Amino acid sequence: ERSSVVSTATCSPAQSSPRGSSPHCLKARFGIRVVRVTVPARPTAVGELVDPFVQAFTDRTRAVALTHVSNLSGIRLPVADIAAAARTRGIHVHVDGAQSFGAMELDLRELGCDTYTASAHKWFMGPKEAGVLYVRRDLVGRIWATGVAPGWGNDAESDLVGARKFESLGQRDDACLAAMATTAGFHDEIGAAEVGRRVTELATTLKDAIADLGVPLVTPREPSLSGGVCIVQVAGGSRPLFERLYADFGIAGAPTGGLRFSPHVYNTMAHIERAVAAVEAMRPAILG
């Protein structure tokens, strides 16, 4: 039986799309199995998000790719619980943190993941074309970079130690990396816990107000099952509403998974009220 990688349909395109995702490229090159897990569309308890993964694990499962917070549903996976189950089977746990890095307080040791990646330009509010990679210290020697450049070393085994093993990528934009440090300093001034508290407050207020309008949500209202991503369920295509949201109300959202709002620390309650008013005005079109 072939080795397998477990992921979900709500992973980012880099992890789940049949065209261009890492697991599917590995499938084409090395013949691994890609197992897609389906989680409940409207979970009411953490266990409902853990069980589908545990049931998908087999003795041939080598890795599980988790999206911490989905940009398609807003669902927040209980990574620590899934990782604990994976660890008993020796399964590598990778976490896509694109929608959690910069939006909540994170302790990667508590999450229990082996690797974690995130882009800098989303909730972290940093530069584009930059991101972060975390590799558990005791796994550095076992993990190979997919691309190397001068500085790697003279043999197949790198001369570099620790994190520098993954930084041998040729010429790079050092100003971009300096901007990452500046952005990290800004987050430190506010405090990760305070950022997470404010994002939860804004997102919860927004979801509750939209639900009170009788407009269905894709995203769970319970903070423990969601993050800052708030997605409104749309009966038809979401792009016309996304364009109207910006043209008529000056609100930049996204059409992925429905009509997506992502309130952050720079938003105020007045902004939330304006978003709710926009949803109310577009309610007939949203409901179809």
Predicted regions and their residues:
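Pyridoxal 5′-phosphate
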Residues: 1-4, 13-288
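Short linear motifs in intrinsically disordered, low-complexity N-terminal regions enriched in Ser/Thr
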Residues: 7-9
